């Protein structure tokens, strides 16, 4: 039995930190839908809904300050993480949610329908086979094992003056060694999560 009151309280407490108090109801609806589908389709390894609040919702929202532009893609989005929380927080931005897993894209289409989220476009395709008409301002992912692999497989997606945003745990010293583009690393804290979190911002320009 899910204690909606407790979940709502956890959400409100964290959203106050992000100054996003107004989106609590929609995030809760997303979380409950994710929890329901997860029992059948194994969309995420996290089963505890309270843990989902911090590790899925808050971790996604924490990268908001570094998103660039209006045209965003979340590569390997899975069940819409971080794409759905970001789209809820920023309804004026457009998000493509890319994944090759049909069950996850079916879930995202249901999220779009039930929650009436108009600024997302779930697409089922492998990243190397996706060729949009224009590049994206920000390419987000937490799905790649290394920064080098992320750039390799998504180079064709980023706009000329665009940005890669990779979500990481510990500071990725060794992953940064082969990166030829200019970059910076931003550390951040997530309510309810202990330990280091950071995101790597990589510009689509080579180091001089």
Curated annotation (Swiss-Prot):
EC number(s): the record gives: 2.1.1.170
Name the catalysed reactions. guanosine(527) in 16S rRNA + S-adenosyl-L-methionine = N(7)-methylguanosine(527) in 16S rRNA + S-adenosyl-L-homocysteine
Query: Which UniProt key words apply to this protein?
Result: Cytoplasm, Methyltransferase, rRNA processing, S-adenosyl-L-methionine, Transferase
Q: Does the keyword Cell membrane apply?
A: no
The cellular location(s) given in this protein's UniProt record come to: Cytoplasm
Q: Assign the protein's first listed, main location to one coarse class.
A: cytoplasm
Q: From the UniProt record, which GO molecular function terms apply?
A: rRNA (guanine-N7-)-methyltransferase activity
Q: What Pfam families does the record tag this protein with?
A: GidB
Q: Please tell me whether the keyword S-adenosyl-L-methionine is annotated for this protein.
A: yes
Q: Which domain of life is it from?
A: Bacteria
- GO CC entries: cytosol
Residues noted as binding S-adenosyl-L-methionine in the record, renumbered to the chain: 76, 81, 127-128, 142
The entry assigns this protein to a family as follows:
Belongs to the methyltransferase superfamily. RNA methyltransferase RsmG family.
PANTHER family the UniProt entry points to: S-ADENOSYL-L-METHIONINE-DEPENDENT METHYLTRANSFERASES SUPERFAMILY PROTEIN
What is known about what this protein does? Specifically methylates the N7 position of guanine in position 527 of 16S rRNA.
Q: Which HAMAP family match?
A: 16SrRNA_methyltr_G
Q: What is this protein called?
A: Ribosomal RNA small subunit methyltransferase G
> What's the source species for this entry?
Legionella pneumophila (strain Lens)
């Amino acid at each position: 039995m899910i204690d909606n009151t407790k979940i709502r309280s956890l959400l409100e407490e964290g959203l106050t930190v992000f100054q996003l108090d107004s989106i609590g109801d929609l995030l809760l609806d997303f979380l409950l839908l994710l929890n329901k589908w997860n029992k059948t389709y194994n969309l995420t390894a996290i089963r505890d809904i309270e843990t989902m609040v911090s590790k899925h919702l808050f971790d996604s929202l924490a990268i908001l300050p570094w998103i660039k532009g209006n045209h965003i893609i979340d590569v390997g989005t899975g069940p819409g993480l971080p794409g759905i929380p970001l789209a809820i927080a920023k309804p004026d931005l457009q998000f493509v949610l890319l994944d090759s897993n049909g069950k996850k894209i079916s879930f995202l289409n249901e999220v779009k329908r039930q929650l009436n989220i108009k600024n997302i476009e779930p697409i089922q395709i492998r990243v190397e086979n996706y060729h949009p008409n224009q590049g994206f301002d920000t390419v987000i992912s937490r799905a790649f094992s290394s920064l080098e692999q992320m750039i390799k497989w998504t180079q064709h997606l980023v706009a000329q003056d665009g940005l890669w945003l990779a979500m990481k745990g510990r500071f990725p010293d060794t992953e940064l060694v082969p990166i030829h583009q200019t970059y910076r690393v931003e550390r951040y804290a997530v309510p309810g999560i202990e330990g280091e979190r950071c995101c790597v911002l990589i510009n689509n320009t080579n180091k001089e």
